Structures are given as C-alpha cells and as structure tokens.
Amino acid sequence: YKPGERWHYSVAVDVTGLVIERISGMPFDQYLEKNIFAPLGMDDTFFEVPEDKTDRFLPNHFWNAKAGELGTMPVQNNTAMSDYMTVSLHSGGGGLVSSTMDYMRFCEMLRNGGTFNGARILSPKTIKFMTSNHLTKSLSASTGGEDPIAAAFPGVGFGLGFGITLDPVLTQTLGSAGNYSWGGAAGTVFWIDPVEDMIVIGMIQLMGSPWNLRQDLGIAAYQSILETNE
C-alpha cells in the first residue's frame, strides 16, 4: 500500500537500517558508532557485548506465576541473552545493549533538539517531525488497517520511532500531551516530556511482569513535580 493509506507495526526500521548501509557504504553497527554513539560519548552501547564487559551484562528475569516468584535467566544458558555475545545480524529494529547513562545521553540529545556533548546529531526540525503524531483518524483498526498501538495504549499515536501521547486521560496515567516514548519486551521504558522538560528512563529486566510498572513509574515521577510548566 502507499504511504498514508495504511499503518502496520512492521520491520520497517530494519529495512531502514539496510538502506543506511546501502547509502553510507558502511556496516550498520559501524555507522551507528561513528555517527551517533561516539559523538554522544555512549561508550557502553553496542550490538555485541565486549569480552571485557560481560561481567556487567545483567541477566534477564521472568515472572513464575505458578510459584509466585521471580526467576533468573542465566546469560550463558539463555538464547535471548547469549545471542549478544556473538552477533551476525545488526538489526535496525532491536538488538542493541546499553546502559542507563548511555541511554540518558541519547535522550538528552533528543530533548535538546538534536545536540548533546558538543555534537549535532539531528536538526531541531527533524526532532519535531519525528516526535509528532503521523497517524490520522482514518488509520485506525476499523478503517485503515492494523493499529495495535491504539488498541494496546489508548490515547497514544505514533511518530517516526516513538509512541506519542495524545490524551493523557485516555492513557490512564499521569503525563503530558506530546510525550514521546517507547518500551521493550522486558519492561525497559523511556519517555521525554517536552512540557515539563523531563526525561524518565526505566531499565527493567523482567519478562511477563504481572505489574503495571510503567504506569507506576509515571505516577511516581509526576507526583514529585510541585510546580508544573502547564
């Protein structure tokens, strides 16, 4: 289908990674290191965990509903974790390992309009375009094709790589219209609030969590604000 006709939660970001390789003539991982990670000082972000940093690579956890307790997925004995030791595919849609501080540096670049650490990564107009909602009412589950984000997160639209908060009331948690965010399967989450000029990062390694940790984090973060910019 043509752009603007439908919306599909797909492997488009992986395709974008391949396009970057073709245009730049560089392997995707090397392009990211040269143009994003190194300029921002993100020294702990990579597809493949270096041998001298494996002791810092945290294991994932899972919720054992039957036992009512957390279980640990050992790094070497879990395929999802051991894949980060020897990487053959550098995916544009996932697979990077990072740290909270590195991710904060990346988020600060976004919050600052595309610049951080003396490096210009993106233009302010590009950031604005990426963090605006690109879904129209016609692109809904009932009229325009697949829209799992709207079904899973009421009040949320979609930009270029970000979920965009359109109506905080419909999201059923505290926040600001215009927040842009995303999360991971094991509970990792970040969002940037342009209204309150705030970044929130949650590094959680828990698959199948029975708790609504993202909403709890949002409530805790926003209840700590005593003077709002709204």
Residue ranges and their predicted role:
Residues 207-230:
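Generic C-terminus detector
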Residues 181:
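Short, structured beta-strand/loop micro-motifs enriched in basic residues and often containing a Trp
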Residues 190-192, 197-206:
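Short, well-ordered beta-strand elements
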Residues 1-174:
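Short, surface-exposed loop or secondary-structure junction motifs
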Residues 140, 172, 202, 211-212:
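Short acidic, gly/pro-rich beta-turn/loop elements at beta-sheet edges
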